[in-house]
């Protein structure tokens, strides 16, 4: 009888095993979700890809890719698909209509460090909300120019003259 007691698990040991299995399943699910998303309108977690070593000064190449992704947050990363566009001087802008309702934009207010993935490469960035009307106009002109090249049914180019 005493041998049987020695071989059985205590409640604490069983709880630890169940907890470890549950934690590993959650980590596996999060990594799987991060690998496949952000996708369409579903946010993702970590952005994987080749890593650029330093921040980029000239983002003009951003106009050559149709989709950009941003990752914000620290402990629990949050990433979304969005439009990004560069001005003729190489400045990078991100589309954010009704920005106050976007989770990623709210996170950036408290922590401006983020990561952008363009064409499989992940870049460190510092995100700043633009409020200056002249700078917003430059970003809008860059957005319209890019959407005329990368026009999709989900993200159509604005009508000429806007």
Roles of regions detected by a PLM:
Residues 31-78:
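Short, conserved active-site entrance elements at the starts or edges of catalytic domains
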